[in-house]
């Protein structure tokens, strides 16, 4: 079975209220359709960072996001993940202002997620 890592934006699109911006609302619809119709075809992973990010903000919205991820497999962070995340930032592949984005990429790559 192929695998996929989902980061917090995906969870927010699944659990969030429909956004008033038509472009964002379309992204939400497409993401929700994928989640409903296709996600079961994959081994879906998250990380502790996703749980931390999902826990932030409005308590009701956070509870909805956490409900989405509660049964997903958790990837473990490691020194290799941290080193790759740092390398992505050093190489300017990910902006230095977005270290969590570098972490999301690194944890999926190091753990061999498709």
Regions inferred by a protein language model and the residue ranges of each:
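Short, well-structured N-terminal submotif of metal-dependent ribonuclease cores
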Residues: 1-46, 55-66, 90-95
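Short, catalytically relevant binding-site loops at active-site mouths
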Residues: 50-53, 81-83
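Short acidic/polar alpha-helix capping motifs at helix-coil junctions
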Residues: 52, 67-73
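Active-site neighborhoods of divalent-metal-dependent phosphate/nucleic-acid chemistry enzymes
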Residues: 71-114
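Conserved beta-strand termini and adjacent loop/short-helix elements that scaffold enzyme active sites
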Residues: 47-49, 77
């Amino acid at each position: 079975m192929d695998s996929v890592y989902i980061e917090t934006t995906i969870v927010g699109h699944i659990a969030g209220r429909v956004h008033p911006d038509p472009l964002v609302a379309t992204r939400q619809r497409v993401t929700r359709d994928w989640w409903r119709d296709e996600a079961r075809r994959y081994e879906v992973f998250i990380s502790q960072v996703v749980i931390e990010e999902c826990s932030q903000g409005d308590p009701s919205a956070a509870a909805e996001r956490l409900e989405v991820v509660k049964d997903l497999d958790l990837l473990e962070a490691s020194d290799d993940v941290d080193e790759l995340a740092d390398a992505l930032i050093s190489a300017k592949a990910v902006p230095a202002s977005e270290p969590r984005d570098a972490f999301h990429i690194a944890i999926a790559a190091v753990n061999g997620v498709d």
